Design a protein with these regions (language model features):
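Catalytic Walker B motif of ABC-type/P-loop ATPase nucleotide-binding domains
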Residues: 1, 236-239
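H-loop/switch region of ABC-family ATPase nucleotide-binding domains
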Residues: 27-28, 271-272
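Conserved beta-strand-loop-alpha-helix hinge in the C-terminal portion
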Residues: 47-69, 291-313
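Helix-to-loop junction immediately C-terminal to a conserved catalytic motif
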Residues: 138
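Conserved ABC ATPase "signature" region
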Residues: 192-207
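Walker B catalytic motif
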Residues: 211, 240-241
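Conserved ABC ATPase signature
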Residues: 211-215, 219
């Protein structure tokens, strides 16, 4: 959910409480619940480990919350680090126009320059055209005739199918093998030690022989991300990759994105996750109504802009 939809959800929860209803929320992101909670039940390994009153839960320090793998109650307290990168080149997108109906374009971009070897956060409200841009960039939309130039070489739609790899928002469409390990091996038969290393870094090694569809939602997301990491593609596109992840696993994904960036690959991350953005992203691309609103590097000034977008809009 974007910030506006999160506000609507918070408003509805408040109404339900006023009506005397009991509301149980299984959640990793806690900031929007800060003023609503009456009780916090902390589960670990299938057991109730802690049971807090609202007052006691809100007294937990940022360090204590992090040790428990909890997202912070206060986004402003989350540590931020600038990750600007001097790009060695750019990825040029031209004539990216697309519409799902005969009405106005869902995507309306004449030209767009993306920094190579960056981790680019693609932000915007629901319906802004973020996922459409991702699908067009990856060559998944036949009616988008745009061209992408990388290192001076043009790639048409079909050629981009082997240039890019996309982790979709609903990863159930992408998990089709009999085991987690086979899912990664299907990406060009990478070396077994590489498969194990990636699974280990994403806390999935113990599930290597498990069927992907038997995993939890967050584990499935991490399997799809692991598959992208071993794909060997130059451009990775991830659509809401941390929506179901706790703090620890979000940080593991952030670390992997930084590693990819250091390898000279480019990642586009469609996200409403402020903590992920300030943990690893180097640039921001802001879309609304299918049009680019702004682009900026996440240097000190850029961090202030992204904080304003997420925190001041709460």
């Amino acid at each position: 959910l974007d910030m506006s939809a999160t506000k609507d959800l918070r408003r509805m929860i408040r109404i339900w409480k006023q009506q005397g209803k009991t509301v149980i929320i299984a959640e990793h992101r806690l900031y929007y619940l800060k003023e609503l909670i009456d009780r916090v039940v902390y589960l670990k390994d299938g057991r109730i480990e802690k049971d807090y009153s609202a007052l006691d839960a809100l007294k937990l320090s940022v360090t204590q919350q992090a040790e428990m793998g909890l997202r912070p109650f206060d986004l402003g307290a989350f540590p931020v680090t600038a990750h600007p990168v001097a790009s060695s080149g750019s990825i040029e997108c031209e004539n990216f126009h697309f519409a799902y109906t005969k009405q106005r374009d869902t995507l309306d971009i004449d030209s767009l320059s993306l920094p190579q070897a960056g981790v680019i956060a693609v932000i915007g409200h629901n319906g802004a055209g973020k996922s459409t841009l991702a699908r067009c960039l990856c060559g998944l939309e036949k009616h988008c005739k745009g061209i992408v130039n990388v290192d001076g070489k043009p790639y048409n739609r079909k050629q981009r199918l082997s240039l890019c790899y996309m982790v979709m928002q609903d990863v159930n469409h992408q998990l089709f093998t009999e085991s987690t390990e086979e899912m990664l091996i299907s990406m060009g038969e990478p070396a077994p030690d590489k498969v194990d290393a990636v699974l280990d870094r994403l806390d999935l090694l113990r599930f290597k022989n498990r069927h992907p569809m038997a995993l939890s939602g967050g584990q499935k997301q991490r399997v799809a991300i692991a598959t992208a990491l071993v794909s060997g593609r130059k451009i990775l596109v991830l659509d809401e990759p941390t929506s179901g992840l706790d703090l620890q696993h979000m940080k593991e994904v952030a670390d992997e994105l930084i590693t990819i960036q250091e390898m000279g690959k480019t990642s586009l991350v469609i996200t409403h996750d402020y903590e992920l953005i300030v943990s690893c992203c180097t640039h921001v691309l802001h879309l609304e109504h299918g049009v680019v609103q702004e682009q900026y590097a996440l240097d000190a000034a850029g961090l202030q802009r992204i904080q304003n977008f997420f925190i001041e809009s709460r």
